[in-house]
């Protein structure tokens, strides 16, 4: 009798080990798994074990497998390294040792190493898989390629797979990608475009391993299974705040080359914690088992995230980090790093469910404990007449009410879902979650474990085992689609850019950090609770803190100049606008304010929305200085920015809001629709003498202001109050207040921020009134006041 070869063992393995021949199922097809980077750290620590678990779970259900470990290493050395990695495979605790040994042996026989370095290597792999399937008479179900390699290698590998290793008709291809997925929005978009030229979206599975952690994976099922109890609670009326936390005790030693490029925000907040945030904040689809519906609702949550500003975050760095960087990367002494190893970020979700609820994201290295959790803290709206000693955990409404998805480690030491007993008794499926016995003396978030209904997994599984199973079964909701990835980078990139030169707060690390990293929030602004102690100075760099300076008053182009650090400047401008509003309302009963768009005023809008409760919004009319010729709902629309960052947060009567009519008769800025004339007529009818109480302008790097551009005479003189103009950048068509109308204002404030404005600031300071070259130079109110508001970077460089 001829003995079967290695690949001929496939059917024998399934028959003997899993099913017994009399009960053997018909094969559902053969699956080839190719692990690229098979000898790397991630593969050794998690991926081979995850693939072994996949083999245990699925081979007995009718599938046959082959496992190809691949790397750049030469065959002999690679085989030795892979064999060493496979030595640590383990079976479930409830499996008999003899059975475990048998299964391990079968898995090893089905696993082989091969070098994948050249196009010819990939061609040979494709031929070998096809030959194996044909030789054994198997039906091919699909091929899984796991990229456990650096992203810079993705393109070449993808090209080779696409050209040489695609399966035939009827079989699937699944390509698994590991982070990082870019460094910012642009790089992520470039990588996504490159991969998209080789693979279809449904073929790609971007891994965020936190989505495989059992407590995180339970968030949506928990919300679904407890809909009745949560429907009335999971909203801004009842939730005080949400905390999404990942703390580590280890530092970045040995990984500083990676950390210098990415830092803590890119490493954990942009991906892991943001993915968790969307699971908490998203609207529940009718069917949480439908991947498409889940992903669609998650994307809606991404799009509802309020834009982050510099004041949305605090950053820190453990004290020995810069020295580690110098040592590992061989940098010269006196070259401190500005890379944050700690970050706290305040996020708001701008929709009806979550308006005003703070989501706190925090992660860091060299902290006092290793722990991860999601904590939903509910408002305490009860008053208890009896003293605290009479409060019963299951009955008293005065005790804290919270739901915690405990990711792991910490005092508890394992994944768990905890619900305060005074909230409701939760349902979790008994086959996968069991109630935790009380552990006297254990305190979680200041309360004994007995205060909670606490559940832990019946069987703990590592994240990669869960995710590999989801890949095998094409459960896309556990992965990051391209559209979600880019939405996340759109959200995080502006903050990362604003922090690029920020000096992080130094902290000793561990328990010695004390209260140094405690932070607090007010409105949309986050700040450390304590000042930086002198003994931790000098830090990395010597940039002074904003609090070291007062607001500076001076002259610019013969008009008053106010200069300060950005936070102080915005605060001063907001206060001045409020003072002007109060004065106008007291004098004539209304305040007419014309606002510019762009990125600079966003911080001002947020400041006005969150910190000026005495502002007479009910008597304020809001106008636009200029508008892009796009629908008002378009992200490029100035009105959309005003709506997102100001209007939805304050009580301005809707009839006092005056967007520019750029979209009439289903057309954008058509001359024959006379939108500019209509806006001018509205101004004439409502604004006395067409004189706004205050006009807020900006200044472009080319000297343009409003949508009045250099080398274009449109809107610089004449009788027209509102004009259509052409911008050199897209979208080209604009509507704008004219320069004569702007100069009728009682007060004009020009806000100029950022180092990129330094050159034009210097140039405009030296020229006369030449609006055709530099439209901003034509701003000079006829009988009103002009005030310049510049941050130090724009003014001093």
Swiss-Prot record:
Glycans are attached at residues 162, 287, 689. One of its GO terms (biological process) is pentose-phosphate shunt, oxidative branch. Residues 25-531 are annotated as: Hexose-6-phosphate dehydrogenase. Residues 546-797 are annotated as: 6-phosphogluconolactonase. Pathway: Carbohydrate degradation; pentose phosphate pathway; D-ribulose 5-phosphate from D-glucose 6-phosphate (oxidative stage); Carbohydrate degradation; pentose phosphate pathway; D-ribulose 5-phosphate from D-glucose 6-phosphate (oxidative stage): step 2/3. The keyword Transcription does not apply. The modification Pyrrolidone carboxylic acid is found at residue 25. Bifunctional enzyme localized in the lumen of the endoplasmic reticulum that catalyzes the first two steps of the oxidative branch of the pentose phosphate pathway/shunt, an alternative to glycolysis and a major source of reducing power and metabolic intermediates for biosynthetic processes. Has a hexose-6-phosphate dehydrogenase activity, with broad substrate specificity compared to glucose-6-phosphate 1-dehydrogenase/G6PD, and catalyzes the first step of the pentose phosphate pathway. Homodimer. This is GDH/6PGL endoplasmic bifunctional protein. It comes from Oryctolagus cuniculus (Rabbit). The lineage of its organism: Eukaryota, Metazoa, Chordata, Craniata, Vertebrata. The gene is H6PD.
